Amino acid sequence: MNRLKDLGTPRPRLAFMAACILLLATLPDFAQASGGLQRVNSFMAGIVTVLRGASVATVTIAIIWAGYKLLFRHADVLDVVRVVLAGLLIGASAEIARYLLT
């Protein structure tokens, strides 16, 4: 019987992967990858900064558009409220996600 052929079945492969994951999870050096966690945190902080800037720009554009429509096009208030609320939801999404994750 060829033992290498038996590794193609799902059960031995699953057991081998589970053993490797348990081994890597118990060793903190492998889990933290010697400083890699700090690099990932700084990268994600940069992404959060960009998302905050984009959210401020989105809310600003929505409010400017709503003001233009109300003042110069004499639009209905309900049409403008939808755009302002959508802009606020898009703009607040980064802060809502930060609140939920921390």
UniProtKB/Swiss-Prot annotation:
Its main location: membrane. Keywords: Cell membrane, Membrane, Signal, Transmembrane, Transmembrane helix. Pfam families: TrbC. It comes from Bordetella bronchiseptica (strain ATCC BAA-588 / NCTC 13252 / RB50) (Alcaligenes bronchisepticus). Residues 1-31 form the signal peptide. The keyword Cell membrane applies. This is Type IV secretion system protein PtlA homolog. It is found in: Cell membrane. Belongs to the PtlA family. Disulfide bonds: none annotated. The keyword Cytoplasm does not apply. The lineage of its organism: Bacteria, Pseudomonadati, Pseudomonadota, Betaproteobacteria, Burkholderiales.
